Amino acid sequence: MATPRLFRLKAEVAPAPSGPIAQSLPVAKIRVDTGVFHLDQLYDYIVPEKLSDSALIGVRVQLPFGGRETEGIITSRVAHPDRAGELKAITKVLSPHAVATEATLTLIENAAQLYCCNPWDLIRSAIPPRVASVDKSLSVVEAARTTQRSAASPIFHTFSPYLPSHRQMVDLVHGVKRNGSVLIIAPDEHDVDLLVGVLSAAFENVFPLTSSLSREDRYRNYLELQRFPLSIIVGTRSAVFAPVNNLATVIIYKESSIDHCEVRSPGWNTSTIAKLRSDNEGVSLIYTGFSPSLNSAYEIDHKKMKFVSQRFQVEARAFSPSEGALLPGRIFSEIKKALNNGAVLFLAPRKCSFVRSLQKCCALRLWWPFSCCF
């Protein structure tokens, strides 16, 4: 028979006292990572005096919520709470560096309302995870400065069909960089690498910001954005939320690419977020590509977006098929000659289709019939 064990009394663990309350603005409104979709409001917490100097807007903090310790971001400091009753206190400041500005937090709040989601779902995409070693290696600086500007109509800048698009970005960035920092959003990491390569050769303070970087490099670059008054940031989707110091221009590179759409919930789009940011902060917004997307074409047709394009002349020739061959034999000599002047594009219709008449093309307008193209 087993010997019964003695009962042990469980000792109640009381929370450690937080000490005296901060004398100036003792209440912090915090965006808490609740883990629950419908608990998306701001919560009031007491700021202890010992944390008052470091508990600033945009700083990560640890706090008690629902019987556990979780993470939050301070959105503001106020003198009095919105509700009566006893408030819990912030446990500790996780990082001395501000990872978001007031403008960034406002952008996330507006985007959450637009996409009907919990703001923390956007924060996970917008702000990279904390790395303690990087926090210790960098000195604390003032949060990124946001210069209020008058918002202008967005612009669509068309690329020349003769040159690689990433090389054409050098002249475009050179024209807008005199106004302040530039944020470029590219569809994928390959485009980011190409852009960083050509821009680093022409400008200083060029920072990549993608998920393909190591956690240390991504977090370090994210914090470095707030240290330079004039910089160029090249990143993928999540970089559209980055707190850039003295931001003047946002450029959406290849804006018709499907990679600008976030595949995870809530499925936001960089063009939409960039438009919200342009309206909130008054930064210039430039879309680029060889041709506008359907949404941009609608904005251009209704005079809501300025269309900037040079006149390009492309020589087009048609060759009839010979002996059922997909590509006629005499076409190859023409291709070799044209390669001396630039890139060559040739199109071959399917067997069941017809050769389109470019003079009668309706540009695939969304109405029926399409007989004008044949």
Where are these regions (language model features)?
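Accessory, non-ATPase domains that flank or precede helicase/AAA+ motor cores in DNA-metabolism machines
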Residues: M1-R356, C361-L364, W368
